[in-house]
């Protein structure tokens, strides 16, 4: 049996994937896992690979979806993206990290798509550090 929190998260990811497709993104993978790492949605738009984190919250929740994208979570997303790029041999592709915030209000939800959700130099602690090893 699926617990309520998992069902809420899955519904949010379904809504986010539909939004991305409506806005011209091509879904490559969903819930991609490598070891203990996971990427919610991997898609592409134009020549850019987009790693999308989906955060779903109830409207009455204590934290906003954007607050859930902590420094530690950003590091895990970068590690997961590196693993996917290695597995797909896609190191030469431009990449970015997006966030889709899903706020549920009863049977309806609102979605906010934030492109380039975080600055990689801030996350990696240096102005010249590239997260992709080339």
Swiss-Prot record:
GO MF terms, alphabetically ordered: nucleic acid binding
SUPFAM superfamilies: Restriction endonuclease-like
InterPro entries: Restrct_endonuc-II-like, tRNA_endonuc-like_dom_sf, UPF0102_YraN-like
NCBIfam families: PRK12497.1-3, PRK12497.3-3, PRK14680.1, YraN family protein
PANTHER family for this protein: UPF0102 PROTEIN YRAN (PTHR34039:SF1)
Protein family membership: Belongs to the UPF0102 family.
Record's protein name: UPF0102 protein DVU_0833
């Amino acid at each position: 049996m699926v617990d309520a929190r998992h069902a809420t998260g899955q519904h949010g990811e379904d809504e986010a994937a539909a939004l991305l497709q409506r806005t011209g993104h091509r879904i490559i993978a969903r819930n991609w896992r490598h070891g203990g790492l996971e990427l919610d949605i991997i898609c592409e738009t134009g020549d850019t690979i987009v790693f999308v984190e989906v955060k779903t919250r109830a409207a009455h929740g204590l934290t906003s979806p954007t607050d859930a994208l902590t420094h530690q979570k950003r590091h895990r997303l970068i590690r997961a993206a590196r693993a996917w790029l290695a597995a797909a041999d896609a190191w030469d592709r431009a990449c970015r990290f997006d966030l889709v915030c899903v706020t549920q209000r009863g049977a309806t939800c609102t979605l906010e798509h934030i492109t380039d959700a975080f600055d990689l130099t801030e996350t990696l602690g240096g102005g010249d550090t590239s997260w992709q090893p080339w």
